[in-house]
Amino acid sequence: EELNKIGINYIQDALFLLPKKYENRTKLTSIKDLTPGEAFQFEGEILESKTIFPGRRSFMARISDGTGFLQIRLFYFSFAQAKAFKVGLHVRGYGVIRTNGSLLQVFHPSYKIFASSKRPVLDNTLTPIYSLGSTKLTQFRARNIIKECLKEIEELNLNEKEIDSIFKQQKISSLSVKDALLKIHSPSVEDDIIKINSYKHEAQERLIV
């Protein structure tokens, strides 16, 4: 039902839900190097976490990577979310950095919490962000759905003519439809992000008519 709200009824609908922008989560930035007003991926150990009263209820977690301190703030959160921020665990997040005096803060970042022995690997491609409107569908879920659809196209082993007949596209690029879809949903850090953001990348030209 949530997929229907954004016009996804078939595999090709999901594949042609093109990203509106991308985030670079292929690298980590030390807390001491975080710049206010810009988005970064950061990581640190949870030193403190608490729900703040009175006034507007909010949650705060303070983390450090050994180079500095960062405060994570949540204003809309569940009990389970707050409970997950256990002191001693580590968190990797992505969000726009703010300042409150000399204090570095980030509001509602996307994040993963993990034990130091189970540190997740960094992404090796740019992370796509999709227009999901007011649906309850999360970016994480949308990315997983599209990954599964890409796998299905790969496993069907269709040739270019068969894929073109499905999508009713005219060839306007040297890329195949399959390669264009893979590139547009998971571009490498070497891809020209300026061209991608202005819809002038060859993968987009292959798909957009």
Regions found by a protein language model. Name each.
Residues 52-59, 64-209:
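Upstream accessory/linker segments immediately N-terminal to the RecA-like ATPase cores of bacterial MutS
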Residues 10, 27-31, 176:
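Short, solvent-exposed coil/turn linker segments
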Residues 1-9, 14:
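Helix-hairpin-helix
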Residues 17-47:
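OB-fold nucleic-acid-binding modules
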Residues 11, 39-41, 69:
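A common structural microfeature
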